[in-house]
Amino acid sequence: MIETIRKAWKVPELRKKLLYVAFILVIFRLGNNIPVPFINTTALQAYFNAASTSILGLMNVMSGGSFGTATMLALSIQPYINASIIIQLLTVAIPPLERLQRDGGEAGKRKLEAITRYSTLALGLLQGFGYYMLIRTNGFLSDTSVWAAIVIIATFTAGSVFVMWLGEQITGMGIGNGISILLFAGIISRLPSAVFYMYEGAKNWAAGKESGGTDVVLHPVMIPVFLIGMILMLVFIVYISLSERKSPVQYAKRVVGRKMYGGQATTIPIKVNMSGVMPIIFAQTIASIPATIAAFVPSMSDSTFIRLFDTTSVIYCVVYALLIVGFSYFYATIQFNPVEVSNNLKKQGGFIPGYRAGRPTAEFLSKILNRITLFGAIYLAIVAILPIVTGAIFRISALAIGGTSVLIVVSVALDTQKSLEANMMMKQYKGFLN
């Protein structure tokens, strides 16, 4: 990745794009530090430290910590991600939207993007109101007037729309997917606080305390163990992210005039983790609904149902893993349609050796997809569940979303690297591929 950036920096046009991305990221980080008035951020931050394993903790990590301090960009990319998920689901369930996506071309793509923007605005308003109610219910407001409510909700909503706009600027004028890069920047910005968290835990152990400022006691010997474990997880995630099953494709020869065309061989790559991190995000959102309800309605926090779905309970982990498997299959079928791929091969005169074009090819690809997706789903479940179990055993809540964070960072880094390489190939800089 660093070598790719170094080579891209030598290309004037790509250097401008990289500088533009850096400029947008500076604005994004500045916005993450502008406080919203009328909120006791110290008490709110302590509350989020206690709720770090819930969906609120995940939102705080994905926002770069701004959600836990109620800054102007507290909602960050969450409304946009939720809007994108909803639109993806609706394009499968509603035929007109499906036709618009499939047959609409560039105009259809722009219409879906406009729908996603308006949905982001609506969800930003809804989540801004919900966040305001969370802050108000727990007594973190210095002013409970209607005017204060309007200012707070409007600021949160405007911040979510502004983040969406920043992401679109990176996508249009920079490198890679803008929203993903903002998500990457938010997670990376939490790295210093995670290091400090582990340092405080070791210091508390040395002092013989039961708890400290970070509410954790950590044996110093465990710090290198966790670091080695994180490195091994990073290597594992990179390896699986780059793994794919290649099915050979042969194209029939045809004669046009005096020349012969076709006959070349290629492959159809099917990635092990085709759906990326989306199954984890969506599964955690649903599995954490009881804990989120308890956060917004404190009177329900002692109910048996809420306790059963505590984010460190066995039931939560089982439901979470099953949801990840289910959504992995769902997103895999959205991104790779065996019937559509088979029909396209048939139209282009291609076939998979040993299988007739049409239905046999579709059945073969579907069989391969199901097997690959099962392995990918189990891999995602392990990445998501293992840090939760480890964090519960060693009483380190910050580990609970460590696997998800590493997976997001790796996925975005690899996608951005591919985007840089594609831009360099367009400029005929291919030496880095050797």
Features from the language model and the residues they span:
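N-terminal cationic and glycine-rich segments that engage phosphates or anionic surfaces
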Residues: 1-434
